Amino acid sequence: MYKKLIKYLYLSYFFLFSLNIYSNILLDENDKLQSPLPLPYNGITYTEDEINNFIDDTIKNNKRPILIFGANWCPDCRIFSGTMNIPKIKSFINENFNVMYVDVKRYEINMTLLKEFDIPYSEGIPRVLVFDEKRNILNNSNTTEWRTARDRSSQEIFNFFQSMSSIN
């Protein structure tokens, strides 16, 4: 009996230990994209100084800065933004990040700001840049990943933010 108990405790401990502590928070059936989708882009042309101040201020507040280049005419931008507004995702983002939406209109404004971060020009939005505390772009190799947000699940978008947080 004692050996069975020890074996059971050992297996239980092993199972609990093998769980990923940083496993993703899962969405449930209540976490749905709401209509109408948001229009987060405001038509403002930003300077490099304004962008740099946003990044620096966010880092000083112990959060990770996110720049999202996009436009209100783009369905992928609106779906991505709408997904970020799902309450569970929004709460997570507010705890870990500070987000700045950068309007590009029809690729007419703010596009030169991408050069500041060595991001090559290419069409397709949203372009999402997530920075760490040293101003490094964490997703430098895949800033174009969300150009197909309409084909992705809300959970995939949430997993992206979870993987970019300082928790991981």
Predicted regions and their residues:
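Bacterial N-terminal signal peptides that target proteins for export
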Residues: 2-10
